[in-house]
Each structure stands twice: as structure tokens, then as C-alpha cells.
Amino acid sequence: MDDFGRRLLQRLVRRTPAQALKATLGKWERLTVAQRQSVDFTQPKVAVMEQLVAIFEENGWTVKHITELEMINYMENANRGMWHAFQMTDPKDDANAVEMMQFKEQFKSHLSELVRHVSVKIKKHTDEALWIRIAWGDSYSPPNHLKPTYVVHHLQTPYVFVTSLNSKQKPFLVQALILSTGYQGIKDANLSGQKLTAIRDLLMKQYQQIFPSKYNSPLTEKNETVSNPHIEREQSEHASKRLQMACEAFGDGIVPQLQTAVYKLETKFRGDANTNRTMTKREGPFRCLVKFASTNLLESFRECASSGIASTPVSPLLSSITLKGRNYFVVTENGLPSSQT
Amino acid sequence: MKVGDLSVYIDMSLLKPFSKLPALNAATILLVEREERFQQNLADALVGDTTVTVNVRLAKSLPLPMDNEESRPRIDLVVFIINLTSELSLKSAEASLKYLDPGYFLGKVCFLATNARNTSVPTERLDAMRKLAASLHCPLLFAEDQTPDGVNSATERLLTVLKVAAGLVPTATALYLSSLTRCTIPPDIDQPSFE
Amino acid sequence: MLNMEQHRGSAVRTPINGVPVQKRSKSYRLSYGSCLGAASRFGFTPTLTARRFSTTRRVSKLHNVKEKINADQLALLVKMEWKLSYVTPLYQFRHTKLKSYSRQLSVFITAEKQQGLAVDVDRVQNSYRVSFSLVHGMAGTDDAETVLIQVHSKHMFAKKDEPQKLIWSGWLTCMNGNSDYLGSLPKDFICLPLFGSSGPEDLTSLVQSWFKQNFDCCIGPLEISHTSLQWLAALWTNCHNEDNIQHLKLIWSLPVAPPLQITYTVDPQDAWDLWGSVRKGSGAEKVREEEEPGKIIDIDEVMSFMQGLNSHFYKHFRLDLSSGSLKEVATSLGSAKYNGKIKISNSKYMITTLTLLTEGALLKMPI
């Protein structure tokens, strides 16, 4: 194995916890059972590395095989890096009929036409998602396997999730995607996060949603904690209404784990008109950037609303996160829902 | 809406101390807390008292909903729980005060502040709290809400005040007790002083 | 929630009802910091003498510290982010004995670091070099002169001829301390209540314990309170017409589970306009026209400024920032964090900022 292969393998070993590495090797079909069992994961990473190098050299495996391993590893541990969502638009009639083999072939051939040196690997994940690994090169340099772009696409949906893509590469990827799927355009979905599963679930609405209804939902009963006949909540109705509205806006149960939401506000100053007449009458927007951050943003928001820190009904700006599946917003005077004024 | 209607409405929403008859050997306490965090623990501890029947009503703010008017017993003591780390907590209590009949301020209201020792509490807020309690002639208690001991000692104090306020202690009245326990502020709270 | 626990922990460690220090006269045991007594169990403490933050501040624009303070010292002061502590008055501290203090502290640090280690004696003697120096020009009329402390050291495996590197620095200052209070101190005490440090924490605690042992003082962590942070937000914004503040950034934390952090970054010009609109009796233009140095800012103006920012926020998100607490304020002039970290990036506004912090330190002292 050459130096570069060594570096690539070393990086993979170093970045992955021992248990995850073991699982990755278990999923890789190339290893024999004996080979798999011969690796002792309790020893230091350096020693594990040497054992793996020996196995690779014994079999004459190269960079190609290491990238294969890296891909399996990434698919199993998708929650790293920053994932950005894109949405394809203007479907043609055959958009829903694109098959995996057809897509694979077309995507590879289109991309290699667009970029001189590029290495593409496509694999189907257990959840039917297509994983694409792209190592980019250009006319003068071979594909850089140290900085691959990962693309995840669910066939028959307009959504594409991308990580580690720079602006130079973006047009090529967009072009190749459009040519090999049945869509004619692609746009930034303004949604990003560290957890691929979270942004996917949010966009595809794969979480427990509560819809507004006239009747009391099961949530109401959940909220009533009558511990003792002598204790009475005077405003239990308000509380359950708040909880209902909180869940309508941000989902019930386990919600997609988003970390941030960003709002760029370019609206008129909306302070108290009585105390601050000068500002409310002022021409031009009051420009500010508001960033919300939490380990689980939707859960934090839900608690804000159910506990009354956030007034209900929930601000349309906040409920747009789930409603529109976005976490980046530019809010201008025209774009502001009328209920805000 | 006519002016007359409005006054009726305001009148109805006021909580009055003597509009209902007291129940035998029972006392009712209303815990008002914006955050609704400490009140449940406190309520559980309060109803554990064996000498009298304690009824606890929990609210986030005043006024109380009209619908419960019928079923609600006479409230003998109103406690405002204020988390000093939150400005909103104090503001909300202030806003609720105007829904109490003035009769309550003769010994049937008390303030319970939590987190007073937390370093993130600005002195100004503590001052505002003390001034509020002093101006209304109400006692101001400090409580520790995170430990069982803190909850117990707060419970004991509230029970003492509650029993007097409900007229269950033959030798004392609410007004008498409050004249002893009400919060006072030092005369120099507003100006720096170096003796 | 976790944060709160920690803060409470630190509050509990702070003596509440005054440390019994016999040497001190009664006259100032009744002064600063007895506001901490307000945290006593009952709402009434008859002897409570409250000392509060000033409700007005003078913003003098002519702080040409650049001309007064040594350039190297100033460069160091504005380069680092400092972790703040409060220090009670130092007993028998002499500004004339700084050389001897330098020697003593070097020996102290070396000895403490050496404990339990068998090291070459010759080497060890040189391994920590401490220098105390005066910072001229950084004191108000009644204040004691600011003292700068620097610790230099070599790597354990550095070559003989390699120069020692600055590994820790700290300073003790008093900027426009309350003159009544300073005047009430007995002669043997020097008041330098604000202590800033930058460097490894073990060195900070060594330096602090040396001070405690030698000058019979108490040292404890100093948070930058909610009110101080609001003051800084206003004071810095107030400078925007002279020096572009680039942005006004406020970080709030809301007490929900999991905790919600909100970063609110306002365009400098819009922040300035809002500030102008809340200044009493003057629109934004009027303030700009007035060129007289030394303006008075009132706490009410600071509060209306924050109120304005919060209500603009509320109208959009229907989320009440006042239910949480302000954790951090930053502009290009500096940044301040609730946990007691401060960076003053522009020397022009150092005096104003340090005056505010000195006041905070004096309030925090458990005398």
C-alpha cells in the first residue's frame, strides 16, 4: 500500500471510535470471518492500524477499497459534518419513474463529462437512500480522496442532502443531478444541520405531528397531573391549550433534532409605539440577525410555548421551521405575515 | 360594551377574601407562579399537613378563570412565588396583584422569593422585590426550591401564616401577624451610604 | 439549570454575613457588600446598609490613555481576554516594594510547582520569572496605582539560550472607586478590588494564594452581572459615532430544557438610532450634534434601550427575553461575559469599562 493509502486509512481509523470501526468492518463484505476476528480492537489505535495495513497489503487492496470502507463508515455514522438540504423543482413527467441503475449510470457519466478527474461511488443504504461519494479533481490534479463530498438522495423524492461541498463544485453537482433525475431545477432548501436524519425527517415530515382540531386531543389528558384531590389547577385549560398549540407547531414526542435556526430580520422597528415613537415612525428597516441554538431546538421551542415563555399562538416565524422545513429565513417587510403588525 | 358592563366585569374578576363562607377546620391557599415549577412540589408538601385540611389552588397568574368560581373555596392566603433569576417572574406577579381585592392586603398575601442567593440575580431586582412587598405591607419569605429541606421549611412557614390567615389560630389574626412579619426596607436603599 | 447550580454553588462559598477580620475597624464593615446580606432568609435586616450600582454614569470622551500609559502595557491590556476576580483591601501592600514582591512570588511559584518533583535545582531557579510593574496613568484621583504582574517561563525541554516566554499575566486595579469608601479605609490598607488574569488557571490560583497569604485579603470570582452587561451594551453603543462598533451582539439564555440560547446581533447604525431615541429629551440627531465631552447616561435610558430591543424581538417571535438572562454582550470595542470574562479591544473606552467593573468588584466583596 502506498503512502497516500496509508494516510487515508489512518485518518479513518483515527476518526472513528473503536466500536464503530468494528461495526464498519463487520458490514464490509470483503473481509473473511477469520480476518475480522483477528483484529483486536481493545489495543491502541496505532496497533489496530498496523493490523489493518497488514490485511490490506496481504490482499493487495488499494485506495479504492479504503474509500469503500470509508463510505460504509459514513453511512453508519451520518451525524457529523454539516448537511445542507436542496430541493429539486419542476419535475418532468418521468420524474417518479427514475430507477436506481439508470440513475447510477447517468449520474456517473454526466459528472465525468463535466469534471475531468472525478471519482464517484454510489451505494444503496438500507433505508433505500442512495449514497454518493464524490472525490473531486480537476484538469491537472487527480481526485482528492481526503475531501470527498457526500450526497444523499432518496429516489422519487425531490430532496438531496449534501455535505462538504464547496461553491466551485456545486454547479457541477447540480448539473449532474438535474440531468440524471427527472427534474429541471434545484434550489437551496435553507435547511442545514449536523444530523442528517433530523433534517431528512423534518423535510419529509417523518415525525409525530399534531394537527389543529376542535376536539381535545389525548394531549390534554396527559397534561393533567392530579396528584391529590385537595390540589386544583385553576388554569389547567389554559395549560392544555398551550401544550396543544406547542405540539401543533413543533411536533409531539421525539422531534427531529435540529441545532440552530437563523433569522435575518429586515423589518421596521416594532417596539412599543407609545414609549418609542421615534423608532416606530422611522423609515427603513431595523436590521438584525437572530440565531436560536439548542441541543434540540424544536424541543426547546415546544417547552417555551407550553410553559408560557413564548406566547401562544406560536409566532408564525417559529412555526415556519416545521411548516416549511427550513431553518434559515430572511424576513422582510413584505414577507412578514400580517398577524405580526 | 357600556361602561357599566366593564365595571361589572372588573368587579367579577377581583378575588375577594370574604365573599364566601369558610369551611370547617380547613384552609385554602392559592399559589401563583408564572413558571409553574415550584408550586407543584410545594402543593404536595402543603396538603401533607395533618392538623387541618389544606386545599391548594394553583395558578400561573391572576385573574382566575370565571368557570371555577362556583367550585372554588374561600381563599385564605394568596402566595406569589417569584423566581428572582427571571425578570418576567416579578413583572407577572406585579401584573396579577391588581386582581386582588384590597381586603387581601390586610394580612392575606405573601411573597415567596426563590433563587435569591443566585449570583445572576441583579441587586436591583431584589430591591424592586423588597420595595413591592414593603409597599403592600406584605411579608416576603425566601425559599430554596431545589432541595427537599428547602421545600419543607418553606411549607412550614406558609402553613404557619395560612393557619392564622384562615382564622384557625384562636389567639392571632392575619392583620396582627402581618404587622409583625411584613417586609420593611431600610431608609437608605436608594442612596449609597458610608458611615 | 446546570448553570444555575454552579452559580449557586459559588454564591454559597461566598461568606454572607461578613468575614470576621479583626484588624478592620467597624466603620467600613458596614459598607460595601453588605448588600449581600439582602440574601438573608428574611426580607428585613434592620442594619442593612445598601450600596447599589450607580444609576448614572458620566461618559467622558477624552480618555487619551494612549498618551498616559506605556504602549507595551496597554497593548497587553487590550490584547487579552481577562478573567475577573474581586479582591478585598490589601493589608500593608506597598507600591514601593514591587521588586521584592517579584522575587518572593517567583520563589513561591517555583516552590509550589516543584512539590513532589525531583528536578535539577539550577534549572528550577530560573524556571519562573515574575515581574511586578506599575501601570502609570491608570487610576482616578483617589485610586491606588494599577499593578501589572507577568510570569515568564521556559518550556521544560527548552534550550539553554532560548528566551523565556510570557505564560501568565494579571493586574490589580481600582478605577474611580467610591471616594467615601476609599477614604474610610485605615491607613495600612490599599484597595485594588479588581483582579484580572489571563493564563493557566493553576498559576492564577497560585498567584491568588500568594496574595491571600501576604496581604491578608480574600479573593473570589467576579461575575459580570445582568445589570453590568446591560450597562456595557449601552455604553458601547453610545460610542458608535466615534468608533464603529461593527455590531451589537447580545446572547441570552432561556431556562427551558434543553436550554435555549439566543444570539441577537443588531446592525450598529440601527442600534445607535435606537439608543439615540431613548436618550432623554433628545432625538438621535441632537445627540450626534452635541460635541461636549462628558455626558451623563442614566440607568433609565439603559433600561429603555434594552426594553426597545426586547420588544422588537417579542413582536417577531412572541418570546419574552426577560424570562431568561443576558449572558454575553459584544461589540468590536470589547466583549463581556456573565462568567466574568472581559475583553476590552479599544483602549479609548477602557476607563469607562474598568470603572463599571471596579464598582461591581466593590459590591461583591464580602466585608
Model-derived segments and spans:
Chain B
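Short linear motifs at secondary-structure transitions and domain/linker junctions
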Residues: 4-8, 52-57, 84-89, 115-116
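Conserved GTP-binding G-domain of TRAFAC-class P-loop NTPases and closely related GTPase folds
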Residues: 78, 82-87, 91-195
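WD40-like beta-propeller blades
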Residues: 50-55, 127-131
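Short, flexible boundary segments at extreme N-termini or domain junctions of P-loop NTPases and their
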Residues: 1-40, 45-48, 52, 59-65, ...
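A short, aliphatic-rich alpha-helical micro-motif
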Residues: 72-73
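Residue-level recognition of the N-termini of beta-strands and the immediately preceding loop/turn
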Residues: 27, 54, 107-109
